[in-house]
């Protein structure tokens, strides 16, 4: 079945306070869709490593307190909520490697990871809320793209936390294999430390060679355009 957006509001651009709650999930439930999953990704901007997506179905009676956009939380708080989410919710995680990103593009790789996370949920979702502008193609249920969804829906916020913590842990492990770049400190983003590592050692197998700064590095160490996100 081809995914579709809500006919009355496919994208949300309203001016409601950016505090995540459960209203969108309850609206979908009222329309006959249950359970509702939230989905988000982490790692679209880095120069190295995978993009990681997560899908989360929260238990309405056991929603962890303090869920929010992962970027608004400290690393310690994300880790705490990550443990709580895994203990109380249905969670699925998928990723697209740097090779996959280079073979397609970051948008397609992100949506593919999100689709696989949603489709791998142990409890099939009846409806999906995704962060951003797109609902992944190839789903078996309808979905709604929510602009700034990780600040509006607790389900999307939970997914953003799971994706972020998972990716950060992956990059910390990658640091043990490729210690010259400082992946544990910046998770692959274009920091000064990362730029220095690329200039000195060249790119490794985790780098996204389709990203313009890395394409330049193949011809010479021109890192001026690497701007941290």
From Swiss-Prot:
Q: Which cofactor(s) are needed, names only?
A: Mn(2+); Mg(2+)
Q: Where is the composition biased (Acidic residues)?
A: 220-229
**What SUPFAM superfamilies does the record tag this protein with?**
Ribonuclease H-like
Q: Name one GO molecular function term.
A: RNA-DNA hybrid ribonuclease activity
Catalysed reaction, written as an equation: Endonucleolytic cleavage to 5'-phosphomonoester
- Indicate whether Protein biosynthesis appears among the record's keywords: no
Q: GO terms for biological process?
A: DNA replication, removal of RNA primer; mismatch repair
**Source domain of life:** Bacteria
Residue intervals of the RNase H type-2 domain: 34-223
Q: Pfam families, alphabetically? A: RNase_HII
Q: Where is this region: Disordered?
A: 209-229
Q: What EC number(s) does this enzyme carry?
A: 3.1.26.4
Q: Where in the cell is it found?
A: Cytoplasm
Q: Report the co-factor binding details.
A: Manganese or magnesium. Binds 1 divalent metal ion per monomer in the absence of substrate. May bind a second metal ion after substrate binding.
* Keywords, sorted A to Z: Cytoplasm, Endonuclease, Hydrolase, Manganese, Metal-binding, Nuclease
Mostly located where?
Answer: cytoplasm
Q: Name one GO cellular component term.
A: ribonuclease H2 complex
Please list the residues that bind a divalent metal cation: 40-41, 131
Q: Which PROSITE patterns match?
A: RNASE_H_2 (PS51975)
Role summary: Endonuclease that specifically degrades the RNA of RNA-DNA hybrids.
- Family label: Belongs to the RNase HII family.
Query: What protein name applies here?
Result: Ribonuclease HII
* Record lineage: Bacteria, Pseudomonadati, Pseudomonadota, Alphaproteobacteria, Hyphomicrobiales
Question: Which gene is this protein's source?
Answer: rnhB
